[in-house]
Amino acid sequence: MYCWHELYGTQWAEVEGFLVLRFRIDGSDHTGYMQPIGEGDFTTILPQIEADAAAQGEPLRLFGITSQGAELLQARYGESVALYTPRATADYLYRRSDLVALTGKHYQPKRNHINRFLSLYPDHHYQPLTTDRIEECIRLEEEWCRNRGGCHDEGVRAERRALMRAFEAFDALGLQGGMLYVGDQLVAFTFGSMLNDHTFDIHIEKADTRYEGVFAMINREFARTLPEEVVYLNREEDLGVEGLRKAKLSYHPAFLELKQRAVWLSERGRACRRLWQACFAEDKPSFVEEFLTGPYRESQMHTREVEGVTVAMAHLVPFEGEGRKIGYIYGVATLPDYRGRGLASSLVEEIVERCHREGYDAVALIAASESLQSFYRELGFEGEVPIYLHTPDGFDFGTGDVEGNKAMLRPLKDGITMPNHLVLNLLS
C-alpha cells in the first residue's frame, strides 16, 4: 500500500472498528475500496462507504472480496450487487517446504535449472538483503530496464517508483530479502514481508537472465532462509499475463487464493443485466458480471424505455490508439418483442452524435453476422479492419477470437484516413 501510493493514492480510515482502504482503480480517476478488514459482519458499514463513493460521483466498487464476504454481500444485497471472480488477480500460494526441497518429477525442471547454475557459477554466494547493499539492487534493476529497451512502459515505471519507495523505508516496513552473487557481481535479488503468522508475501524478484537458472536459484535460496513457522509463500497474481501465469504454475502452487470484486448496481445497471441475459443467452452469467464489475459505466449506456421498462440498449466504450480517439459501440440489444421499430438504429445514431460532439475521430463496432454487417452499412459503417482492444483487466470486447476480430468503421472527421488495422487501449 505504501510502496504503490503514487499510482493508487491509497487512503485509509477506521469505521466502527473496521479498517477501510480507498484507492484509485488501476491508477485511474475511478475510486475503489477493499473489503473492510475487521471482526464481524462488514456489510453493516457499507452504507457509509457507499455514501462516500456517491459523494465522488461513483458507484461503490469493492475489491479483494473473500468467498465468505461474497456470501454476506449476496445475502444482504441480492441482485443489487454484481460479483465476479477474476482469475488474473488470484494469488499463488506455495508451501515453503516444496520450494526448498523441490522433490518429485514435477520439480525436475527446476532442479535442472539449479544444477546448471551451480555447474556454471561455482563462485556464487547468497546473503540477506541489507540496506547497505540497496544501491547494488538499484543498479541491477536499471540494467534490467536497459536490457528491455528502457523503462518506457507506464506499468514498468510505476513498479520502479514502488521499488524505490520500498528501498527508502526498507527496515521501517519490516521487509526481508535476499541477494544472489556470482563472484562480486549481484545477479538477483528479492524481498517481501510477512502477511500473517504463517504466510510470507514475495513483493518483488529481479534477476539478470544472462545467468542460466538464476530465477530458480534465488527462489530456492530465499525460501531456505525463511523461518520454519512460515508455511506458505504468496507469490501474488499473474495479472492475466500468459508468460507470468506459465512461470507461476511451473512451481506447482498449493492453492490459488481467489478474490472477487463487486459493484453496486442502480436500476439501470440491473436493467442492463436483465436485457443482456434476455438478448445474449449464449453468454454465461459470469461474463455479464465481468462486464458489469469491469468496464461498464452507467453514463456510457444509452437506452430506450417503453412504459418504464428498458427494452433496448447500446454502450459507448472509449478507446484510443494510433493517435486517434475511437468510440467503440458494444452490446447493442433489443428485446425480441420490440425489434423492427428502429430502436437499435436510433441508439447507434445517438452514440455517433455524442462521439461527434465529444471530439472522437471515428466510431467502430464488430458485427457478429453478415445480416448485421448489412444493417450497419446502412448506418454509414464500412470496411473490415482487424482490431485489437486492450483493457487493464483483460475483458474481451470482441468475438472471443482475438485474431479474427474485424471492425466496421464510421469516420467522424474530414480527411481522416483509417489504418489497415487498429490497436486500441481502453480510456478510463
Task: Report the location of each language-model feature.
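C-terminal "cap" of GNAT-fold acetyltransferases
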Residues: L93-L99, Q108-R111, W264-E267, A368, ...
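Acyltransferase donor/substrate-recognition loop-hinge adjacent to the catalytic core
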Residues: E79-C151
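C-terminal appended segment following the main domain
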Residues: E205-E267
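Conserved active-site alpha-helix within GNAT-family acetyltransferase domains
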Residues: G69-L83, L239-L256, D361, S369-G394
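A conserved beta-strand-loop-helix scaffold within acyl/acetyltransferase catalytic domains
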Residues: M1-V15, H124-D208, G269-A333
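Conserved acetyl-CoA-binding loop-helix of GNAT-fold acetyltransferases
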Residues: D41-A51, Y211-R224, T334, G340-C355
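Conserved GNAT acetyl-CoA-binding A-motif
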Residues: Q56-T66, E228-E236, C355-S369
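A short, internal acetyl-CoA/4′-phosphopantetheine-binding micro-motif in the GNAT/acyltransferase core
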Residues: Y33-D41, H203-E212, I329-G340
